[in-house]
Structures are given as structure tokens and as C-alpha cells.
């Protein structure tokens, strides 16, 4: 993962961690980090990690301030969705993906036969996650995860990941020097976090190692394996861009409403290309990230399978759209709005502070817009009779600023904001998904 240029100093919760790291003298630095590392040993030992592996992996550990900073930059949530999709589904990425489809035609055919997962989706995930292996991340995974723990940035997420990473080293699938990845510990061509690797990675070529770092067959097979076990349905589309009847406000339909495609068609929601739905009995929900101002989609079960890979719906949309482009489809028919102001860190932090004041969110505001914040935004929108898209816009921020918070409100409990790809069990039509690889795509 690249370093974020010209990043602003982070001023709250995790921001103080960055400033504290920079301000501590080297002696304090080392003492605090080593005490933290030693406190991790009992859990690692209980998980079967040998002391020699633990010591070798964490010898001389110091926290990485860049990891703390990057944890606060997740483009799935802080960039307008149109801008995010333009970057991830560029003409160049489509062109390269088509070349990869041709180069690995035999491998992808065997994976389709074995796992039933569409080859275009497998390659699209590869393209979105690491730009086809050219940008897999250059941070030492052990150091990144230990930093997230020892700075308190995302300790709840990172501790089981670190222990799993140590067990991967112990098994011999990869060397410590080669175990590089993202700030969140996501690894290899298709960016598995350690716990997902341990459960779902595949040794496709039979050499005794599940090498997602340097072995493309292993990496792509692992992705197919993970999607299949996440509920992928063979032969089903991920979704369709649709046209809605004039005057119909897609924001007024809950994303949890599942109906057969034939039912949606009966009320005038049809594919933008005029073609019939391939399997009209398949159930779908209406997804309109920008309401009537942008494209609308009917998304099916396979969209939710992609959400297991990354909980951000904008990510799943990027994968689905790139897969369509690789198949020969064109750009979105309806344009994305370009007039939405990108909230600054200070504005995002203020947004969270106001949500907390209204009893919709707990914790300290840090400007990280993750699943808990998005759900709080939706709850507020519902309470005011607004269109429910969960988008923290400047207009909505101004509305919150003008409205005094209710008196004696008990804050709603929320979970720690996790990296973009980490969520909870997928129980609703577009509910947060279970944990998956956690690289934040930047390009």
C-alpha cells in the first residue's frame, strides 16, 4: 500500500496515537512497545505459537506511525462513490484485466468448474485488491498488526490477526521477510487477512504451501474458495444497473426488501439495456447509493457474497462493475453526481460528535467513517423521514448542526469501527458481512 501524501495530522482518538508516537523519546517508545509485545505472549502461546517464532517475528518491534495514519483513510467511506469507482474501474484496469483473463484462461476455467465462481469476478477482485498483483502492499504484516494493537488503534480486530499471522509463519507458508501487505495486515495478490487465510486459502499447485504472495494459481483459487464458502451461487449475476419509473424515489425502499426480479419488473424497474432478467425468480434488493441523483441497482445474493470479502457496498459495486466490464459490458448508463462535497477530517469528526450527542453512536469521534457510523447516519435519516442512503453528506451535516440534540438521550451501543472489509454476520439483504480480507483499495 502506498503512503498517503500530504495527509493531515489526525486530531482525535487515533490521531492522538500518531502524535504520541512521534513525540515519545526513543527509550519510552521501545519500553512501551516491548511491554505490549510481552503481554501478547500468553495468548500466542495458548494458540500454539512457539516462543522462538514469537521472538523472531517481534524482535525489536517499534510501532509504525504510518499504520495508525493509514487506518484513518478508507476511501470506501470517505470518497464520493463516483470518484471511488472511477479510480478502481478505469479503462486501464479493464484492459489489463482482459489480458489476465486470456493469460490465465485454463486456470480460471478449472476454478469455475471446481468452485462455480465466475472467472470475471475472480479477476475483478484481483484487480481491485492489488491491481493484478502490482500493488500488494509493502508493510511488514507482523509490525502493522502489532502497531494496531499496541497503539490501541484497532486492537480488537488486530489481536486475532496477529496470532494467526504468527501461526502462518510457523507453518512455513511464507518467510517473515516476504510476509508483506497492507496497514491492516491484508496479504498477497488478493489480500487475505491472516484469519481468512488460515480458514480459506488453497494450495492450488500442490507444492505443500498456500502461497498467495508469489503464486497466482494459489491466490486466485483461494479467492474462488472463499467466495464459494461465502454463499456464491453458480450462474447468478451479482446485480444489474436498472432504470426506475419517473417520480419513483429509490431511497424510499429499504435495502432489506428482497423481491423476485419479476416483481421488480412488474413495477417498472427494468435493466438499463432493455434486456430481460436472466433468472426472473432470483430475489434482489434495490440499491441506490445516491438515490435518484445517481445509478440504481438490483443486487442479488452474489453481491452479498462479495460483501463477505469487503463490507463496504461501494467495494462490492466496484468488483461487480469491473467484472461486467471484463465481460464486455460498458460504463454505467446513468452518471454519478459530481457536486457532492468531500467532507474533511474535521467535518467527519464533527459529524460523529453530533451523532453521539443524538444518542446514535458511542465512543470518541475520530473521523473514521466505518459501518457503525453509516448505520447511525441511516437511523438519523429514518427518524427525520429523509431518504435513507447512509451517506454523510455536507447537507446532512449542516442539518445536524442546526438541530439541538434531544435531552437525556442514552447513547446507542456500537461496535469498534473496523477496517473496511471487517464486519459482522450477514443477516439482511445488505447487512454488514462477515470478516474477510482487509486491504483498502486505493487505485
Name each model-derived stretch:
Residues 28-30:
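Boundary at the C-terminal end of the N-terminal hydrophobic targeting segment
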Residues 49-281, 294-299, 303-323, 327-345, ...:
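Catalytic glycan-binding domains that act on GlcNAc-containing polysaccharides
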Residues 2-16:
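Bacterial N-terminal signal peptides that target proteins for export
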Residues 331-335, 395, 401-443:
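Proline-rich, low-complexity linker regions of envelope-associated factors in Gram-negative bacteria
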Residues 23-25:
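N-terminal signal peptide c-region/cleavage motif recognized by signal peptidases
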Residues 32-51, 55:
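Mature N-terminal segment immediately following signal peptide/propeptide cleavage
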Residues 36-43, 107, 144, 351, ...:
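A general alpha-helix detector
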Residues 343-348, 356-400:
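Short acidic, glycine/serine/threonine-rich helix-capping segments at coil-helix boundaries
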Amino acid at each position: 500500500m502506498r503512503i498517503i501524501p500530504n495527509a493531515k495530522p489526525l486530531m482525535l482518538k487515533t490521531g492522538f496515537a500518531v502524535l504520541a508516537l512521534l513525540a515519545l523519546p526513543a527509550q519510552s517508545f521501545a519500553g512501551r512497545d516491548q511491554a505490549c509485545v510481552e503481554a501478547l505472549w500468553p495468548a500466542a502461546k495458548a494458540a500454539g505459537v512457539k516462543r522462538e517464532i514469537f521472538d523472531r517475528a517481534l524482535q525489536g518491534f517499534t510501532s509504525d506511525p504510518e499504520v495508525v495514519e493509514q487506518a484513518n483513510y478508507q476511501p470506501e467511506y470517505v470518497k464520493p462513490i463516483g470518484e471511488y469507482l472511477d479510480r478502481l474501474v478505469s479503462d486501464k484496469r479493464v484492459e489489463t484485466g482482459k489480458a489476465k483473463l486470456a493469460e490465465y484462461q485454463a486456470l480460471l476455467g478449472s476454478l469455475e468448474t471446481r468452485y462455480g465462481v465466475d472467472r470475471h469476478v475472480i479477476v475483478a477482485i484481483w484487480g481491485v485488491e492489488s491491481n493484478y498483483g502490482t500493488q500488494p502492499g509493502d508493510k511488514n504484516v507482523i509490525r502493522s498488526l502489532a502497531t494496531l494493537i499496541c497503539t490501541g488503534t484497532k486492537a480488537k480486530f488486530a489481536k486475532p490477526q496477529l496470532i494467526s499471522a504468527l501461526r502462518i509463519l510457523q507453518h512455513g507458508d511464507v518467510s517473515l521477510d516476504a510476509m508483506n501487505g497492507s496497514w491492516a495486515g491484508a496479504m498477497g495478490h488478493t489480500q487475505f487477512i491472516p484469519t481468512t487465510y488460515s480458514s480459506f486459502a488453497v494450495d492450488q499447485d500442490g507444492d505443500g504451501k498456500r502461497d498467495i504472495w508469489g503464486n497466482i494459481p494459489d491466490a486466485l483459487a483461494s479467492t474462488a474458495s472463499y467466495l464459494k464458502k461465502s454463499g456464491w451461487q453458480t450462474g447468478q449475476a451479482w446485480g444489474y444497473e436498472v432504470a426506475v419509473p419517473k417520480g419513483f424515489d429509490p431511497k424510499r425502499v429499504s435495502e432489506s426488501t428482497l423481491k423476485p426480479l419479476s416483481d421488480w419488473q412488474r413495477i417498472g424497474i427494468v435493466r438499463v439495456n432493455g434486456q430481460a432478467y436472466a433468472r426472473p425468480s432470483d430475489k434482489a434488493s434495490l440499491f441506490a447509493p445516491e438515490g435518484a441523483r445517481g445509478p440504481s441497482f438490483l443486487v442479488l445474493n452474489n453481491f452479498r457474497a462479495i460483501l463477505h470479502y469487503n463490507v463496504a457496498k461501494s467495494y462490492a459495486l466496484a468488483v461487480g462493475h469491473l467484472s461486467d466490464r471484463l465481460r464486455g459490458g460498458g460504463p454505467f448508463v446513468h452518471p454519478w453526481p459530481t457536486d457532492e462535497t468531500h467532507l474533511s477530517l474535521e467535518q467527519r469528526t464533527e459529524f460523529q460528535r453530533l451523532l453521539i450527542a443524538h444518542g446514535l453512536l458511542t465512543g470518541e469521534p475520530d473521523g473514521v467513517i466505518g459501518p457503525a457510523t453509516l448505520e447511525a447516519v441511516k437511523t438519523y435519516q429514518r427518524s427525520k423521514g429523509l431518504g435513507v442512503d447512509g451517506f454523510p453528506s455536507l447537507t446532512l451535516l449542516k442539518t445536524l448542526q442546526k438541530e439541538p440534540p434531544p435531552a437525556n438521550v442514552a447513547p446507542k451501543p456500537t461496535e469498534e469501527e473496523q477496517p473496511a472489509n471487517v464486519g459482522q454476520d450477514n443477516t439482511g439483504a445488505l447487512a454488514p458481512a462477515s470478516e474477510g480480507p482487509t486491504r483498502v483499495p486505493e487505485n
